[in-house]
Amino acid sequence: MFDHVQNDHYLPELDCETLASGRTYVTPEGNKYPSITTVLGELSKAGIEAWKKRVGEETANKISAQASTRGTAVHELAENYLNNKEDWSKGYMPANIFTFNTIKPVLESRVNNIWAQEVPLYSDKLEIAGRVDCIAELDGELTIIDFKTSRKPKKKEWIENYFLQGAFYAAAFFEQTG
């Protein structure tokens, strides 16, 4: 059973617009900021295009669609589980439950005191916004948690964007909450 922390920090919901250039969030002051995933996607565009050429457009589209579906399902399973839903896995494909079960022991043994899940964060300094998966204590320390799925293990140098995304969420959270 996970504890959910009542905190004094208000994180406002943001309107979201999907444009041809990517997702944009509108802050309470009316500022429009690109999402962190849109910004990071621009940085990795060349690598993605090279991969598509290597495997072929049809294969790349198939892999991308499968990855997106799997990622969404595992993310929803994690959210349900952290929200202490009794039927957290009902209606999900066995393969997605299997994938979630690889992170379940880490959640059970190291995560608690959940501050927020699926909340928007933005930075007026960086002029970027995004939606963080979870803010909770990991081993007793308040931490940004972003769930990622992959078919294969990845080297650190391949996932620099993950670290940049997490660093952005931490900076935006600090900016909004002090």
List PLM regions with ranges.
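Metal-dependent nuclease catalytic cores that hydrolyze phosphodiester bonds in DNA/RNA
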Residues: M1-A129
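Mg2+/Mn2+-dependent nuclease catalytic core
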Residues: W115-G178
